[in-house]
Amino acid sequence: MASIICGSLAFDTIMNFEGKFSQQIMPDQLHILNVSFLVPSLRRDFGGCAGNIAYSLKLLGGTPLPMATIGQDGGVYLERLAKLGISAEFVRTIDDAYTAQAMIITDVDNNQINGFHPGAMEQAWQTRVSARSDIRLGIIAPDGRDAMVQHAEQFAAADIPFVFDPGQQLPRFDGAELRKFVELSTWVTVNDYEGKMLSDRTGWDNAEISRHVKGLIVTIGAEGSEVWVDGVKTHVPAVTAAAVVDPTGCGDAYRGALLYGLENGWSLERCAALGNQVGSVKIAQRGPQNYQFSLA
């Protein structure tokens, strides 16, 4: 069984600030905000939600099929996917754009300030989900706005169950659009902040959202996960990390585990437990695709 992973392929530039943002930003001066952070360390990684989720799913033994767009500078990413044994058959190159780029600054409390250039990602609507016998599952992760809308409709038309994972793109949709996403999807996953925004915009609380799908999974950081099914919440405890080094990509690592469990017919609670475990391993390593994990 293969899973289509709709989302971005991106290059991440990750910088670490050896202080606290809260000590540099004055709340009463936000109207004239002008700050600069000295970042002694800088690293460039392969990233993007589709790439990160595919990496996690592949580590676990699944079959990811990322559906994404890259730019004229994306050849090295194709080489990366080939080296990992991940198919790029649904990856399209946009010659007049750059691959999406994320600029991330993390402070000592693991707070992050991000800048994101979408580049070729905004052309992801040029890719298309179609029914195929080996494709049994999908996920819509943060991607170009039009692509997310079209892919949700295409998954539904192809009768492929999928996870709706709006992430940082959630603010780009209004309440009616988000309600439609929920109604088309089979599962929804968000972090606690995104969950509050999703509830605010749809007018549905977590219990109500869970009644429209087979399950709602809410990650709550160091506290683990909440699984909502038919209005009933189950808490899935966190796994203590060996070290807290870099949160970048933890949510995507979790979602790869979620897909693996769904591919194998697991309960959502078991999926969430694996997600917590993989996330705890990822956070102990720098970068979204530099950790190792095995179910053996």
Indicate where each model-derived feature is located.
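Gly/Ala-rich phosphate-binding loop of Rossmann-like dinucleotide-binding domains
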Residues: K58, A156, E263
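Conserved phosphate-binding/catalytic loop of the ribokinase/pfkB sugar-kinase fold
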Residues: E89-I94, A102-D146
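Glycine-rich phosphate/adenosyl-contacting loop at the front of the ribokinase-like
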Residues: M1-L65, V76
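Conserved phosphate-binding/catalytic region of the ribokinase-like
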Residues: G203-A296
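Hydrophobic anchor at the start of a short beta-strand
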Residues: S3, T63-L65, A88, F162, ...
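Active-site metal-binding loops of divalent metal-dependent hydrolases
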Residues: L9, D143, A253
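Conserved phosphate/ATP/ADP-binding segment of small-molecule kinases
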Residues: Q150, A156-V163, G167-P237
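A glycine-rich beta-to-alpha transition motif near the start of alpha/beta enzyme domains, typified by
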Residues: T63-F90
